[in-house]
């Protein structure tokens, strides 16, 4: 259990995973995250090394500013990522919400509830390479079972909205994942 914690880093601010074994029963609340690559990262391996299962994780009451990505879920080696709940999360971010599983049936039970992600200016020129790295859609998800978005809002002004190919690209997922996208 982690609570009432400010974090700042140039890498992922809160990373769950990377290594061997199983990580389970993580509880984190009332976090303030500043200036990192990802606000929250769930990662089963790093560049093909390691294999960690991630299960039963809950984040609540999180604020993040200046992060590239509010949430990244990356499964690349067949390990399981299950039963992750993120609720009451507010982020000012430059990149997309990215949740991608390389293998079908390894990532399941992902819930984002009462989350607001506001897109802010990036310090990088929007070249094709930068667009591919940061994501071409505001929300990207693939190969996730039981993906649930409840009151998820992604806010973007008209000028920034032109820098994206679209609001959402969700492929090979099951669940309830409608969300509100707004131009402000």
PLM segments and residue spans:
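Extracellular/periplasmic carbohydrate-active domains that bind, remodel
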Residues: 1-184
């Amino acid at each position: 259990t982690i609570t009432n914690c400010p974090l700042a880093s140039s890498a992922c601010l809160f990373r769950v995973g990377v290594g061997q074994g199983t990580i389970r029963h993580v509880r984190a609340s009332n976090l303030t995250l500043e200036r990192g690559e990802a606000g929250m990262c769930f990662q089963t391996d790093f560049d093909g090394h390691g294999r960690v299962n991630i299960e039963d994780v809950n984040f609540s009451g999180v604020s993040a500013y200046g992060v590239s990505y509010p949430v990244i879920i990356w499964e690349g080696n067949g390990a399981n990522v299950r039963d992750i709940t993120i609720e009451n999360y507010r982020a000012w971010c430059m990149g997309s919400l990215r949740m991608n599983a390389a293998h079908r049936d390894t990532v399941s039970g992902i819930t984002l509830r009462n989350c607001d992600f506001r897109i802010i200016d990036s310090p990088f020129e929007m070249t094709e390479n930068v667009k591919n790295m940061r994501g071409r859609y505001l929300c990207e998800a693939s190969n996730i079972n039981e993906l649930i978005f409840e009151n998820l809002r992604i806010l973007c002004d008209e000028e920034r909205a032109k820098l994206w190919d679209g609001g959402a690209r969700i492929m090979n997922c099951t669940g309830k994942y409608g969300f509100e996208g707004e131009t402000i």
